[in-house]
Amino acid sequence: GHSWGPKRADLANDPTYGGNTDNAFTQKMGKRQGQYYVPQRAEAGLDPWATPQAYDNAKDFFDTGITWSNSLNVAQMLDKSSYSISLGNTHQDGIISSTGMDRYNVKVSADTKLTNNWSSGFTANYITTSIDKAVTSGNGLLRTVYAAPPSYDLAGIPSHVDGNPYTQNSFRGSFDNAYWAMENNKFTEDTNRFFGNVYASYQTDFGTTNHKLNAKYMVGVDAYTTHYVDSYGYGSNTGGGRGQIENYGWTNATYNSLLTINYDWHINEDWGLNAVVGNEIIQSNRKKYYEYGTNYNFPGWNHINNATTQQTEEETWKNRTVGFFGNVSASYRNMLYLTLTGRQDYVSNMPRNNRSFFYPSISAGFILTELDALKNNIVNHAKLRVSYAEVGQAGDFLENYYSTPTYGGGFYTLTPIMYPMKGTTAYTPYYTIFDPKLKPQNTRSYEVGADVNFLDNLITFSYTYSRQNVKDQIFEVPLASSTGASKLLTNGGKIHTNTHEFTLGFNPIRTKNINWDFAFNWTKIDNYVDELAPGVENISLGGYVTPQVRASAGEKFPVIYGVGFKRDANGNRLVDENGLPIAGEAQVIGKVSPDFLMGFNTTLRLWKCTISAVLDWKQGGQMYSRTTGLADYYGVSKRTENRDGTIIFDGYKTDGTKNDIAITGANAQQVYYSRLNDIDESSVYDNSFIKLREVAVNYKILQKRSIELSVNAFARNILIWAQLPDLDPEASQGNNNMAGAFEDYSMPQTASFGFGFNIKF
């Protein structure tokens, strides 16, 4: 049930559970003055009678997170060589007791000069990370924390029934009790990563001062393995009550070979020329595995071998890219600059007829203050710049009819015949069809800008405008089940982006012991979906059936799609005969892209002390907050505290007149918020906020030739002013396309306070 029941002070007089009234419980156990019966306490084997009081379930649930970071770096310069060794460790205890992280890293690098012309070196890094996570959306921990009424002692009442740790005891039975889930549901992520390179270089000036040649060959590797375990214990609401486990992960190894030859020619006092040619080979080997199991044979062992039903998948990819590139840069009197580049790529992950593509760029710069006529004491630097660039991008193409062992049936999503049957295994086509005419995606960028500094850099100004046009965008188009597949990987999308970026900086105090600078940056980014594939008006990027985040043709990218308010021809929200808002059709109910982003940063150095601060401002844009909407629906938000008040919804009646129908009665708010829960648009909020991102202080205690000692302290995310109620707008979740647009019982953002010290000797 919801928390819309009687007031806490009236619980003892509740006709069903009150200890002051005649009901089934007092008839059996006698009256308990001033108390009320709590069924969950009885299930846990406790005294079922409790005195009404308020509990701060969220405060009781969350801990204070702690992060420890330690690092040691040893470096030495020798006559013709140098080396460094770095060791690091980070340990983090999360704000939920079952979460945390441990990371260890080591880095070794060395360089040596073999002869006057030859040198060599290497860099090697190894990182191991282990993370204990908490699931949020879906059957997440916070659903029972935020939705529990303040009269319920979530932390004090055991999360399982007396004598059976695998039968939950919860206020909201459709979701796992948060404390039970911390003990029985485990989500882990373990990653081991190695990356590094080795190089050899040759350089010469040919015995002159005007010519320099540098040739460098480098080979590198970036290999990692990430293993995930998502397990719901026996008794969880996920997995039908008998548990569920998913083991999955990736092994990825990318090998890189890079050869560059750089030639620099100082032609004369006016002209300079630089040319670079090179070759790059990238080989990527990926392997994905997936194991799914459900219905544990017995409780207490969350393991795939304990599952009665198991499913496994394995996929491998191999991609190779061979690229040839070059650029030529010319300069005139350190005033005019022109650069031309080009790259030809040959890829293996495209259809055979479309495996090569060329993308060029051109850029120019003009430093006006190098002209004698413009040299002055007011404008000490002024530069104009312009550029055009193309970037090609291949897709992940496979030959059609790549098959995986599964079941056969006649329809993609229906399985009337189950295999293997009598020892015969069936196969079905891969669920994605790949367009045999797939072309590389192409992005064309245009940019103009200016940089101007005044009064010996007392004031600095920069402005950039850029436009990106993406054509032949590669994306997956959903298909009907009758096609035998679920997706088609093809070209078709066109997106363009307009970006304005403005930076203004000041450095009013510049002395030996005191320096103060501050800067503002303003950015406006507008992404537009011009078109998708023929016949496709929108594509889901994540979410539920409704609401969800979409890319929609003719709209800004992305948009929120869901059930909206029903409106009249003038856009006014309509109400029914009871004064309740009417649910309309599924439609675009929010636009995610902000109007602008603005940042402010400042640094003040006072002798040995440095103080800095960062402030961010996001204006406009919208996001969907399921947490806020359900808090209203359950009656646990501050907005629902006026239980005796009446509500007149701001809308219009179907006859076109302003709504004046009052929603009244003891359960008026419950009825009202229950209706809003059916309308996704009611949970779409303005995403504007201003946040004091960081304040930091550093003080040098000791600074001598052989040793340096400093201490530092910081505070992050300490103040926020936001339109979204209850939550930090940056507590959204999802992939990159959904980030900032969708929130469903997300982990709260945290304020962080820390200190540290550095020793150099």
Give the residues covered by each predicted segment:
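Conserved small-residue
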Residues: G1-P48, E399-N400, T406, G410, ...
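Residues embedded in well-ordered regular secondary structure
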Residues: G1-S97, V135-S137, A181-D190, Y199-Q203, ...
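Extracytoplasmic gating/loop element in the C-terminal half of outer-membrane beta-barrel translocons
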Residues: G19, A24, K31, E43-L46, ...
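Flexible, solvent-exposed loop segments that connect beta-strands
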Residues: P48-P52, S236-R242
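Short, surface-exposed beta-strand-loop junctions and turns on beta-sheet-rich folds
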Residues: H91, P581, K618-G620
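Extracellular/periplasmic, surface-exposed regions of secreted and cell-surface proteins
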Residues: R103, K107-W118, T123-T128, D132-P149, ...
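Conserved SET/PR-domain catalytic core that frames the SAM/AdoMet-binding pocket
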Residues: A519, V529, V563, G584, ...
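Glycine-rich, aromatic-lined ligand/substrate-binding cores of catalytic
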Residues: K591-R626
